A protein has these predicted regions:
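Helix-breaking motifs and short loop linkers at transmembrane-helix boundaries and internal kinks
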Residues: 38, 70, 91-96, 125, ...
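Cytoplasmic helix-loop-helix junction between adjacent transmembrane helices
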Residues: 101-136
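Helix-to-loop junctions at the C-terminal end of transmembrane segments
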Residues: 58-71, 153, 251-263, 344-345
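Intracellular juxtamembrane helix-capping segments at the cytosolic ends
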Residues: 110-124, 302-317
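C-terminal transmembrane helical hairpin of 12-TM major facilitator-type secondary transporters
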Residues: 262-309
Length: 375
């Protein structure tokens, strides 16, 4: 492997680590902002959904803008959203400004995942291992984010947003010095669009839609849910993110280095069953210890779903296919947090969070369906 390929792959790992810090912190940040400004659950859901809308639009922009301004300029432009978004959150409490900030963070998140997926996938000898390591880096960043926020909170309520802005600008600088063009990113969209006619491709996209919906709802709402119900004390509730992403990191590293998955489709079915069982248990938990253990188990069960599903696309994994699969799947992260916010507003947060069992069931159904396909 050439030095430039190694540099691009490692830059993808590092950038995705920083993205884990910036993206997953949004669930804690929205809880902090809710306490500071006292807005309703509906606004919380709106902010999280705006972030997901930015994530979705970034995927499509990543496919369109390179033809106009070039790949490098596209990546540098879109990934600036982490630093800029969190910075304006730290300086203003106006709702429109906060909405813009979450949208910009979402744009950076979407552009980062698309870019890192190609940087790592195109420069890894073992695609499945590379994807799980990359997502493990993301989980490590997510694991550390509550500690960054807790330390920053000691200096003031708005300081966490400024610390996250600094992380965002570091990510942006990483892309500024990294060559953006890889073999996969140089492919012309007209070379092969056969994946658009593949039932397997759309089944995997549906699976990722449900995975995005379930995961984003938990990372975005769980802190608010635990604090609102008094299941976990306010000072400890932000560390539920650490529990979740600690489990995710362990599971992804095990898949990458220890567990050899012989049949990815059977593995995804087992993951889907685990997600349903543990999420149902999580919703029935009434004590701090039980809630933490079940959250760990739920995150562990879901951890391998995304990288395994993307790797299962096989020959269909390209710049063109990722430009459709990932943005389409990310719409699940728009819809479900918004639904939870609306349901919580009218029926209580318990019912709102319980509705997240629907995408959990969807993961199992799509996993079973894609296994039955003969392609």
């Amino acid at each position: 492997m050439e030095k430039e390929q190694i540099f691009q792959r490692n830059a993808g790992f590092f950038a995705f680590f920083l993205s884990g810090i910036c993206a997953i912190s949004s669930g804690v940040v929205v809880s902090i902002l809710q306490e500071i400004y006292g807005f309703a659950y509906g606004m919380t859901g709106t902010l999280l959904s705006l972030m997901s809308i930015g994530n979705l639009l970034a995927g499509f922009a990543s496919g369109m803008l390179p033809a106009k301004i070039g790949t490098k300029k596209t990546v540098v432009l879109l990934t600036a959203g982490y630093g800029a978004g969190y910075m304006i959150m730290g300086f203003s409490g106006w709702m429109l400004v906060l909405m813009l900030g979450f949208f910009m963070v979402g744009v950076a998140k979407g552009s980062t995942i698309n870019t890192c997926t190609i940087l790592v996938a195109d420069n890894s000898g073992d695609r499945t291992k590379g994807m799980n390591i990359m997502h493990g880096c993301y989980a490590l960043g997510a694991l550390l984010c509550p500690f960054f926020i807790a330390a920053a909170m000691k200096a003031g309520n708005t300081v966490p947003m400024l610390v996250l802005a600094a992380c965002g600008f570091l990510l942006w600088l990483t892309f500024c010095v990294t060559p953006a063009e890889t073999k996969a990113m140089k492919k012309d969209w007209n070379i092969d669009k056969s994946f658009l006619k593949s039932r397997k491709f759309w089944m995997l996209t549906g699976l990722l839609f449900c995975q995005n919906a379930a995961e984003t709802s938990v990372t975005g709402w769980m802190v608010t849910y635990f604090k609102g119900n008094g299941i976990i004390s306010g000072s400890l509730s932000p560390y539920t993110v650490t529990v979740m992403w600690g489990a995710t990191l362990i599971a992804r590293l095990l898949i990458a280095f220890v567990i050899h998955i012989k049949n990815s489709y059977s593995a995804m079915i087992k993951m889907g069953i685990g997600c349903i069982i543990f999420y149902m248990g999580l919703m029935m938990a009434s004590t701090q210890t039980t809630a933490i253990l079940l959250l760990f188990a739920f995150a562990f069960a879901m951890a391998g779903m995304n990288p395994t599903a993307v790797a299962s696309a096989g020959r269909m994994t390209s710049a063109a296919s990722m430009g459709i699969m990932l943005p389409a799947a990310s719409s699940g992260a728009i819809i479900m947090p918004w639904i939870i916010g609306i349901v919580s507003e009218y029926a209580g947060i318990e019912i709102g969070m319980a509705s997240n069992i629907i995408p959990c069931a969807g993961m199992l159904l799509f996993s079973a369906a894609v296994k039955r396909l003969k392609e």
